């Protein structure tokens, strides 16, 4: 079966209603029922609970509490690299941005402008730059961390669809990551600006950041934007490896970096499993002379 045919049912499903229902159920305390759901989930997806800060599944009051579980200190050491991987997951794609086009899958590209919600001036910073797209499967740790030190300057909520973001859907739905609901976070770093976008999906109840809390719901039809620092509030500065947000059920992150001598980890390739804290990219050695 072709990828386009495989994703056809997703066009027909009531994705918003399913996602709302999943979020409702996942946030409710149901005692032994919750524990049994978690137990079955752990068994089905082979979740490694030994690395969780709390490995006792009966201690989680809701499925969301389990899904956003913390890791034990030292479970994800940081590599010595300019940029470290911000999540556990699998590489969807990475590489150069061609003018303003990001490669999604064979035959599919989407623009940086579309990804960030139509702001052409913001997108222009990443023309001919670099990108990385990482998919978080249900078994993965679902907190998102900083690839490098950064100071938050903007956050943009972009309403959209709620297609699944698994590899089959990425190959079958044009412009998937610029089509789905997303939260675009813009940071300033020592090497210039960068974007870390959290892309929603079917059953993803919500996305949250450490400085704002839950961004969605409520879901709306209009782009919403926040500028930082907010009036009367201190700057939001996060260090490399520090948590910046989380998914309540899994999805995808897309990172954008400006044009420059960035060299991705030579071991990286599409489909490869990656872990939070491993080396993602460094500045090319010849540019430091």
UniProtKB/Swiss-Prot annotation:
The keyword Lipid biosynthesis applies. It is a peripheral membrane protein. The modification Pyruvic acid (Ser) is found at residue 251. The record marks 250-251 as: Cleavage (non-hydrolytic). GO terms for cellular component: plasma membrane. Is synthesized initially as an inactive proenzyme. Formation of the active enzyme involves a self-maturation process in which the active site pyruvoyl group is generated from an internal serine residue via an autocatalytic post-translational modification. Two non-identical subunits are generated from the proenzyme in this reaction, and the pyruvate is formed at the N-terminus of the alpha chain, which is derived from the carboxyl end of the proenzyme. Its EC number is 4.1.1.65. It catalyses: a 1,2-diacyl-sn-glycero-3-phospho-L-serine + H(+) = a 1,2-diacyl-sn-glycero-3-phosphoethanolamine + CO2. The active site is at 88 (charge relay system), 145 (charge relay system), 251 (charge relay system), 251 (schiff-base intermediate with substrate). It is found in: Cell membrane. One of its GO terms (biological process) is phosphatidylethanolamine biosynthetic process. Heterodimer of a large membrane-associated beta subunit and a small pyruvoyl-containing alpha subunit. Catalyzes the formation of phosphatidylethanolamine (PtdEtn) from phosphatidylserine (PtdSer). Belongs to the phosphatidylserine decarboxylase family. PSD-B subfamily. Prokaryotic type I sub-subfamily. This is Phosphatidylserine decarboxylase proenzyme. It comes from Polaromonas naphthalenivorans (strain CJ2). The lineage of its organism: Bacteria, Pseudomonadati, Pseudomonadota, Betaproteobacteria, Burkholderiales.
């Amino acid at each position: 079966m072709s990828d386009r045919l495989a994703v056809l049912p997703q066009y027909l499903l009531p994705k918003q209603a399913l996602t709302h229902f999943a979020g409702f159920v996942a946030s409710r305390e149901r005692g032994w029922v919750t524990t049994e759901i978690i137990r079955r989930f752990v068994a089905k997806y082979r979740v490694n609970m030994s690395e969780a800060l709390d490995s006792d599944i009966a201690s989680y009051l809701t499925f969301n509490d389990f899904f956003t579980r913390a890791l034990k200190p030292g479970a994800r050491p940081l590599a010595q690299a300019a940029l470290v991987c911000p999540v556990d997951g699998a590489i969807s794609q990475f590489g150069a941005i061609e003018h303003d086009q990001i490669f999604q899958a064979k035959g599919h590209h989407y623009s940086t402008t579309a990804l960030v919600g139509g702001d052409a001036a913001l997108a222009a910073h990443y023309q001919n730059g670099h990108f990385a797209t990482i998919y978080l499967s249900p078994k993965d740790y679902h907190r998102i961390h900083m690839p490098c030190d950064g100071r938050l300057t903007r956050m943009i909520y972009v309403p959209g669809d709620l297609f699944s973001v698994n590899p089959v859907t990425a190959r079958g739905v044009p412009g998937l990551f610029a089509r789905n609901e997303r939260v675009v976070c813009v940071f300033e770093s020592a090497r210039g600006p960068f974007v870390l976008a959290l892309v929603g999906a079917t059953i993803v109840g919500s996305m949250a950041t450490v400085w704002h809390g839950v961004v969605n719901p409520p879901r709306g039809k209009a782009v919403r934007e926040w500028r930082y620092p907010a009036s009367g509030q201190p700057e939001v500065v996060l260090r490399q490896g520090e948590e910046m947000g989380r998914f309540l059920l899994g999805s995808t992150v897309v990172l954008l970096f400006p044009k420059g001598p960035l060299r991705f980890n030579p071991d990286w390739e599409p489909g490869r499993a990656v872990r939070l804290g491993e080396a993602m990219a460094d500045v090319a050695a010849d540019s430091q002379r």
